[in-house]
Amino acid sequence: AGILLFPRHLHRVPAWQSHLTRAGIPFRLRSENRPLAPGEVLVADRFGELRAAYAMAHRAFVGGTFVGGGHNFLEPLAQGVLPTIGPHWEHFAWVGKELVDQWVCTATTPQQAAQSLLLPAPPRHAVRAAFAAAVAAKTDGAHRIAHLLTPFLESRIHP
């Protein structure tokens, strides 16, 4: 088990290196391609590895959610990982509050977020299946609307 840090923008990797060094936290870059030592933080410095990381994770904190906007918490859910987010998820409000209330741990402080990450992880297959069912319930909207509108449109075309 370890902590993996995936900066949203790779140009921020040096800033994370400086921050971890100042804090006395051992880390290594993903590009070093060596096993993670106990207590080390892995800092991702490559694109395209977040999905695989979620597939191996037990818990996930989705950054950018303690400031306005938020980031994509659907990615860990799709991999069967219950995500923890901060109070800001406006960019993903289209998902719906009921899905967030049921499948996302929302923390109001960084301390709450850290505590939630220490909780036992629910079974991956259960999270993945429940998320897939929630998404399926929200799909096919265009087809349903077309089905409802067809009689009305036909009555206008063929009065």
Named regions from a protein language model:
Residues 1-159:
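Nucleotide-activated sugar donor-binding and catalytic core shared by glycosyltransferases
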